[in-house]
Structures are given as C-alpha cells and as structure tokens.
Amino acid sequence: MVKVSICVPAYKNPVGVERLLESVKVQSFTDYEVVVTDDSQDGSVEEVVRRAEVPGMVYVRNAVRKGATGNWNEAVRHASGEYIKIMHHDDWFTDRDCLARFVEMLEEHPEADLAFCGSRQVMLDGVGNRMGEEFDRAISDEHLKMISEDWRDLYIGDYIGAPSATIYRKGAPEYEEKLTWIVDVEFYMRLLQKNPRFVVSKEPLVSIGVSENQLTESCRTDGTLNIFEYGFVMQEFSLLSEEKYRQKFIQIALKYKMPFASLAPYGIPKKEYEKAAAKKRREDFVFYVGVAKRKVREAFGKKRFT
C-alpha cells in the first residue's frame, strides 16, 4: 500500500491537469499514487496524462459521466493509499515539499483524521493560464478557535477551504452527491462529527486556480441551489435550535432575495425572518443614501455634503 493517493477528479481542462501533474512529479515525497478519473467526453485529458508519465498513475475514463461530486467519489474509490489527497484539476502543489508537509501533519498527529492548510489564490484566464495576480489566505485565529470549540460553526463559513487544501485518512465517508456548492463543508462537518480533532498549517501548501469558468462561480449566483443546500445541511446536523445557524440560513435567503416561503419547509420562524429582513432593508437604505451623497460630492466638487 502506498502512503498517499493523490486523487484528481478531472473534467476537460487539460492545461490545468498538466500543470498539476508537473507539480506532482517534482515532489520530494514520493510514496504516492495518482488517480485520475476523467469525466470528459474527449481525449484531451487522457493525452496529457499519458504524456506526463507520472510514476504510480491510475487513469480511469468514466464510461458514464458522474458529474462533479460523483467524480470526486469515483477517484477516491480507486485509491489504495493510507491517506487521501484530493487535488482538483485547477489546483497544484505550491512547491516541491508540499506533499511531504501534508503527510507530516497526519503522521505527527495520529489522533486526527483531517489536516488542512492555507492556500495561494491564483487568478486564471478562460483557458486556465495564470494571469499573474495572486495572494495567500489561511484560517484566522478567531475562526480556528471557533471550529476547534464547535465544528458545527463551519455552517457559518467554510473556514477550512477548498478540498485541495485537505488531506485525510482513508475510510472517511463519501462526498454527498446531492450537493454541489457546499459539498466540501458538509463533508468536513461529517468528518469532524466523528472525530473533532484536526491539524492545521497556515502555509500555502497548495495553489488554487480561480477563474470565472468554474462550477463554483455558477453556484455562487444560484439562490434556489443555496437554499436547498444550506437547508439540507441544517436538517442533517439538527442546527435549527440554535439562533446563529438560523440567522446564517436567513441571511442566505435575504442575499438572494428569496421569500420566506423558501425557508418555511425547514422550520425557520416567520417573525425571525421578517425581523432580519427589516434590518437588512434599513441597512441597505443607509448604504445607498451614502452612495448617493458621495456621487453628489463628486459631481459638484464639494468637500462636504449633508
């Protein structure tokens, strides 16, 4: 058995897959296999995989398309390693020692099933090429304290980050295929529900490719999908009884201008929704009045306008 299975659920994007595989080949830690499950209809990804000649490669072309989350699970099903290292096809290891650092986190902390790191966010163009703009991000001390004390607070925000920033022990549950947008959050919550111990490094061990063409960008603007997924997770983990989680769900609805009827099936009290909606209207009014005043000042060149 190899130590790590690097699982790459691929769909098209040969540019990204090639960059990822090149970053794998230079890793100082070499006790790994690479599992690529290809959901593409054409042979562009397969060609890149064959050409890369990565040691320990397992390539699987899905006979029937699995979809995004289904393809994640398909990659993990073919893994034989002790540790599972998901790497999405837009992402790559930041430098040659990053895989070693991931392994060290779990090796040095046998009490934990999950480890995660910071990331380098890299802007990509429409075909996956780097555009030059990038920045590092990592969990804050405040958010680290929150999820250390109560893993359910991941419902309030994905403080762990993208799946590529994680490594976990084989035997974890599969990703929930009913979900698309917060599938990673739900997965982390199930892992930590079983074992709340985790390891974190704020180093940007992975680089995350960010572009407007990603699936996450379409999910970001879909109110109906967000209500379904946050409602699903609220029910799964019995979060309704706590106000902070109800308020998170209500704020999601208000963000997408979804009516109370969209929340009612999940047990959200109508008065609580109406109170939050009224507060948001007041805040929006103050904001837009401020915008209008700034525009008037700019138009008339005045230093002060009241």
Language model segments and positions:
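Conserved nucleotide-sugar donor-binding catalytic segment
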Residues: C117, I139-Y230
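Short, acidic, metal-binding catalytic loop of nucleotide-sugar glycosyltransferases
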Residues: E22-D31
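Glycine-rich, basic loop-to-helix element that forms the pyrophosphate-binding segment
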Residues: N62-A79, W92
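N-proximal low-complexity "stem/linker" segments adjacent to membrane-targeting elements
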Residues: M1-S23
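A conserved acidic beta->alpha catalytic loop
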Residues: T30, D38-E47, V64, H88
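Short aromatic/hydrophobic "clamp" motif used to bind/position activated sugar donors
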Residues: I84
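Cell-envelope/extracellular polymer assembly enzymes that use nucleotide-activated donors
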Residues: V2-S5, E33, E186
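Conserved donor NDP-sugar-binding/catalytic core segment of glycosyltransferases
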Residues: D97-M131
